[in-house]
Amino acid sequence: MASGGRADDERRIAVAMDYSASSKRALDWAIANLLRRGDHLVVLHVLHHGGEEAKHALWGKSGSPLIPLSEFRDPTAMQQYGVHCDAEVLDMLDTAARQLELTVVAKLYWGDAREKLCDAVEEQKIDTLVMGSRGLGSIQRILLGSVTNYVLSNASCPVTVVKGK
């Protein structure tokens, strides 16, 4: 057994998901190139605080409870979290879960995506994080900061960045 009571071959792979084209490419890449039979896939969402103060107060730094794929598929259930799931992403998750016998869960956080993604890696004991790159130019990256650059520098696990086509 590995630390934390996990089997040595049990992997926890996370994909940062905001439903943008780049995050969908990251999910597609993880399914095609990284995930293998029996893995745990954690879909990480980070939402801004706006309008979610009650949920933020309830779950604070630790985020939402783990949301199983069956609940993640239910639009009514996901509305309570302020997430509107994308049919393409749900189809990708359903297919991967079935074909690779994955355990798929979602986890929501509220706040700064840079910090929350790094927190999630620690809290969820993620082995590898996959995320998309929006492809900001160098000036935009300097002015706005880059979630990707921050996570690459601060996450405690390997991070794979999937660039756009």
Kindly label every feature range from the protein language model.
Residues 1-5, 22, 33, 119-165:
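Gly/Ser-rich helix-loop-strand patches that form or flank binding pockets
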Residues 2-75, 83, 94-98, 102-105:
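Small/aliphatic-rich secondary-structure junction motif
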Residues 79, 83-91:
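Short, surface-exposed alpha-helical segments at coil->helix boundaries
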Residues 108-116:
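Charged docking surfaces used in two-component/phosphorelay signaling
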